[in-house]
Amino acid sequence: MAEKRNIFLVGPMGAGKSTIGRYLAQQLHMEFLDSDTVIEERTGADISWVFDVEGEEGFRKREEAVINDLTLEQGIVLATGGGSVKSRENRNRLSARGIVVYLETTIEKQLARTNRDKKRPLLQTDNPREVLESLAGERNPLYEEIADYTVRTDDQSAKVVANQIVKMLEES
């Protein structure tokens, strides 16, 4: 991989996008960015607050603006929010402006990785499994639609997955 193309990580919450993204950026000597973190920095509030005050629609508008800005950067690894693919504009920008890696995982792994995380507004419910299954049905086809590569993250450490991605990129 001679030139440093942007790498965009997509996938459901709990797939490991942020953790894997940090390792990947380190290995490739690239900058790591997380769209949710940038939204929080720009609003001065956490994602839960944005959801509470502006609703999901307000959050998605902010997310769209952030993804537009960040995908114009050069040489970055970007961890996107799980729902970012709901926007056609986001899907188009991610596809056109870099390499999209879909981090795939099971509902069981998502539940295990997110069960104590209070910063996930969509999971603040009595039945998170039902929510995750519904989100998977809606979003998994969208991740697949834009993915240049797909990597399962279930039973591997973040470092191992990052190494796999580096290898895939070197071979292409």
Curated annotation (Swiss-Prot):
Principal cellular location given in the protein's record: cytoplasm
Assigned GO CC terms: cytosol
Location within or outside the cell: Cytoplasm
UniProt-listed InterPro entries: P-loop_NTPase (IPR027417), Shikimate/glucono_kinase (IPR031322), Shikimate_kinase/TSH1 (IPR000623), Shikimate_kinase_CS (IPR023000)
One MF term in the entry's GO annotations: magnesium ion binding
EC number: 2.7.1.71
Keywords: Amino-acid biosynthesis, Aromatic amino acid biosynthesis, ATP-binding, Cytoplasm, Kinase, Magnesium, Metal-binding, Nucleotide-binding, Transferase
UniProt: substrate binding residues: 36, 60, 82, 139
Binding positions (Mg(2+)): 18
Cofactor(s) required for function per UniProt: Mg(2+)
Database matches in PROSITE patterns: SHIKIMATE_KINASE
Pathway membership, UniProt: Metabolic intermediate biosynthesis; chorismate biosynthesis; chorismate from D-erythrose 4-phosphate and phosphoenolpyruvate: step 5/7
NCBIfam families: PRK05057.1 (NF003456)
General function of this protein: Catalyzes the specific phosphorylation of the 3-hydroxyl group of shikimic acid using ATP as a cosubstrate.
Protein name per Swiss-Prot or TrEMBL: Shikimate kinase
Organismal lineage: Bacteria, Pseudomonadati, Pseudomonadota, Gammaproteobacteria, Vibrionales
Gene name as annotated: aroK
